Amino acid sequence: IKYIVNTHGHVDHISGNADMKKKTGAKIIVHEADADMLVSTPAMILSMFRAKSSPAADITVKDGDIIRVGSVSLTVLHTPGHTAGGISLYSNGYVFTGDTLFVESVGRTDLPGGSWEVMVKAIREKLLTLPEDTVVLPGHNYGRMPTSTIGHEKRQNPFLR
């Protein structure tokens, strides 16, 4: 394991960073706008989730950056709205969408740093412009199936109509 890529800085996505980094030596990656979130999760939130605090990011990324792992290249798509630094990662017909786009749903925007308008704009401009057969791999399985496609989300996602 070379990298631990956080699609955003919420505790349910970063709480494994410390153990994973310790066990593997992998570098932690997050968007520059969410970097502070890794090291500033309130103690109460950590306690609620029985989570560990995260080490600081080793690498920060921005829109258009490429993360290379062996022969795989992941293109960073800045998809804010769930958090200011939310990212999706695109590679060869697959997109990891974190908590931005779910199967027939979208991420919540009522937490600090969230914005419905910003998220919908990011989804429309960065994700729905990908090829329709692009496989959507969300950060949580909140739909009736674990994955989807961009074409399916365009047609069936009630939040994007």
PLM features: residue spans?
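Active-site HxH/HxHxD metal-binding segment of metal-dependent hydrolases
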Residues: 1-69, 155
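Metallo-beta-lactamase
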Residues: 42-45, 51, 73-78, 83-161
